[in-house]
């Protein structure tokens, strides 16, 4: 099918963002925590897959990882800074747990008739440098995202005297900068000295381009989540 990868990537944005909001609608705060764990683990696996889309080769994982920023922004908007930071800590712990479990598989000696140990090792035997770079970048950019969201919120409320308005500004103002930090920190820590600097530059530009699009596209979903919370106050009182 022509443009199959492009179609799937665009559709996945709506699927992942919509899925997160659905988790919130049916399970409240716990649904957002659960989604954070799911997207953290899935992104670690997806990032190993290289696809050709929009004229360039790129790794998967960017879109579902972007939904983790939507999760913290929804948590900030509805439940506050403390719960948003808790969401980030759950994501960090899920990341560490997945890395430790997946690496422990390689301590076993496969049976003579085993046919899966080799492929599994190929998939999950990431270099420690890449795994640590991913974990560090996630922790830094997500914590910054929560801080920036509430910094923007405090500024707009003080300047305009309205706490409810300018959701779009605090959402995009925090996420766009956080995603830039994520792209720069991860790629420099993971690939400096591995790839030529011009290649790293291309990865940075294309990766951040994807995050700009997903960051702008997630704004309606924050509004939708807030609307759901207003119509269903029991989700907030849990």
Residues covered by each model-derived region:
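Hydrophobic transmembrane alpha-helices
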Residues: 1-75, 82
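Transmembrane alpha-helix boundary signature
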Residues: 45-56, 78, 100-113
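Small-residue-rich segments of transmembrane alpha-helices in multi-pass membrane proteins
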Residues: 36-48, 91-103, 177-179
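Hydrophobic alpha-helical transmembrane segments
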Residues: 7-11, 33-34, 63, 88, ...
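Membrane-interface alpha-helices at helix entry/exit sites of multi-pass transporters
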Residues: 82-90, 163-170
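Alpha-helical transmembrane segments and their cytosolic interface
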Residues: 1, 5, 17, 150, ...
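Transmembrane alpha-helix/helix-exit interface in multi-pass inner-membrane proteins
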Residues: 89, 93-112, 138-146
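Membrane-interface interhelical connector segments
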Residues: 104-129
């Amino acid at each position: 099918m022509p443009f199959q990868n492009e179609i799937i990537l665009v559709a996945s944005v709506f699927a992942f963002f919509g899925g997160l909001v659905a988790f919130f609608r049916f399970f409240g705060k716990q649904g957002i925590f659960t989604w954070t764990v799911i997207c953290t683990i899935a992104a670690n696996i997806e990032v190993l897959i290289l696809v050709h889309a929009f004229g360039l080769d790129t790794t998967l994982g960017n879109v579902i990882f972007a939904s983790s920023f939507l999760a913290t922004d929804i948590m900030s908007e509805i439940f506050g800074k403390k719960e948003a930071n808790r969401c980030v800590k759950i994501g960090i712990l899920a990341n560490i747990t997945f890395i430790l479990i997946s690496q422990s598989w390689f301590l076993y000696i496969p049976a003579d008739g085993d046919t899966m140990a080799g492929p599994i090792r190929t998939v999950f035997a990431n270099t420690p440098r890449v795994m640590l770079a991913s974990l560090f970048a996630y922790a830094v950019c997500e914590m910054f995202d929560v801080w920036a969201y509430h910094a923007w919120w405090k500024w707009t409320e003080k300047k305009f005297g309205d706490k409810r308005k300018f959701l779009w500004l605090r959402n995009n103002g925090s996420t766009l900068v956080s995603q830039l930090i994520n792209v720069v920190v991860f790629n420099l820590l993971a690939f400096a000295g591995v790839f030529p600097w011009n290649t790293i530059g291309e990865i940075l530009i294309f990766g951040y381009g994807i995050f700009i699009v997903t960051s702008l596209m997630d704004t309606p979903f924050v509004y939708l989540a807030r609307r759901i919370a207003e119509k269903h106050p029991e989700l907030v009182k849990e």
